[in-house]
């Protein structure tokens, strides 16, 4: 049975990174199988050759860590679009910002929400200015900075992720190591391995 799937992400082309590449490959592969896949991604306010399946939600001028656009009042925009698409499944790729929108819309429209855990988020805290400062202090042997950073990594982030993952109907781990990492979270949501695919041309040489 063919499905209508909404992919939701905080970064996408023209941004270059592992998550945008993974989303594009997955969307293309699912379309080749006959499914309809719509991508909800931030507006980078720069020229990009989008197709009719890509929806760009509004963003603010400033960016997180100089690269990730901050969504600007996007719930209404995404909700209006979803209400016209008859979506069967929401596949979200980030737990914050668009992640909150995805789970809220999924609940409101009774649409299952799945989430791919692409990133060990605690490893990227230092890209945010306050935590980058603490990381520098910790590297210099400052015990207070190290303690605060450790608390943020082990308590704040994990508690937030626990709550988010419990709102999803399924979690995909790209690797077994990520699946093993998530097991101590003790969530009721099923965690299955779904590796990131490679284009078939990679195997033709």
Label every model-predicted segment.
Residues 63-89, 94-104, 108, 155-159:
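An amphipathic, basic-hydrophobic alpha-helix
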